[in-house]
Amino acid sequence: MAQALEDGNPLPKASNRPAESEAPSDPQIKDNHCLGRYKVQAVRDSANLSQERIFHSALTVSGASWARRRGELRELLGLQGAAPAGWLSEEHLEPAVPGSRRSSGQGSSRVCLEPREHAWILAAAECRFEVLLEMLEAEPSLLMREDPITGYSVLHWLAKHGRHEELILLHDFARRRGLPFDVSAPGSGGLTPLHLAALQGHDMVIKVLVGALGADPSRRDHSGNRPCHYLRPDASLNLRELSGAEEWEIERDRKRENANNNSSRTTTTTTTTSRWLKRTPSASCIKSTGVHYKEASQPVKEKKASSTQEGQGRCLRRYLFPFTQNR
């Protein structure tokens, strides 16, 4: 009986472990419907967070090209099958291989230069003609390669530095190789080699460009000026005509030159006359000089007359009183 009571009402047993402080537990969601919505929201948040991390990592990849980042964006947007209109294909998205025909072609919008192109631009700016010829023998397509900053080709630099002989040699090289040779190609600001030659005052370069190489003197730069507008003021009329001056401009310059010559002659004549007048004595000066001469000559005449009279008196005394000669 006692055993049955003990089994029916068991007494709590003392525990040897210390009482643990109960930590606040998460709120228990008893509603099954709320629990389902909570799980769905948690899954969505984790998916959005992972996509956001992937998106930011795709945008901040160091050293990745724009084509690769665009491909990753396409994958995130689920556009692997078809590219939107205006996007390049996967072949065009690949970076150009150094030394390939596509990477070294003319008219490229790249800013990064190959070592050979960089060396060519430096040699052209310094007018090292022997180095330029060696590089042209190895790669003739560098002849009309322009500096991406100034827009100058080797023709611009040679014209700027007054190298007319080198211009003729380059023209002969291009003609032998059948290469394009545009002596009127515009550079930065629309300046042609003829503009630069006029700016620097290289008369022989102007004559070679127009007379021998067939440069167009009527080309205008971005300011609307022809090469003749950059000539020095004392340039000859023949040089102005070679540089693209029109007939009315040549006539105006001729009249201006004649007027300057006439004014210079008049000034020279006036200066000579004034100097001659300064050297020639005036009438008043002559009269005053004559009066002073008379005044100065009177004492001399009086001295001469007195000395003559004194001599005559001595002779008369000697004649009348000869005994006084020895005294």
Swiss-Prot record:
Biased composition (Low complexity): 260-275
Full protein name: Ankyrin repeat domain-containing protein SOWAHD
Chain positions covered by the region annotation Disordered: 1-31, 251-311
PROSITE patterns (UniProt xref): ANK_REP_REGION, ANK_REPEAT
Keywords, alphabetical: ANK repeat, Repeat
UniProt gene name: Sowahd
Organism of derivation: Mus musculus
Domain of life: Eukaryota
Family of the protein in this entry: Belongs to the SOWAH family.
